């Protein structure tokens, strides 16, 4: 999957997908939705191989990257990612947050090269909007 195949994310509330100040772009949290429809639900389960969540993580990350690129004007490109935050709704006892976040990092590296890798946080939470398994937020620079 490449972010070029994604349509702009559809906000699920009273917010914008991304905002820009100068050369910094902050995205809203993005879940694995296509055309506003959540494609993966439920918490990340301890007994499910991480590979089962790869598509959901990459879709959420692609939505965030698409939102960031939506703030560019003609002739601009994203120069890189400053930070990546990956929220993981998981069952109690889940410990592979960073390994799951690696799917997002790999997606960004493929899309932007070495500039796609910035600081990263992977956080476990009890629930996410719409019962999404992951939510991703980016800070990018132009």
What residue ranges belong to the model's regions?
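N-terminal presequence-like segments and the immediate start of the first folded domain
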Residues: 1-84, 90-142
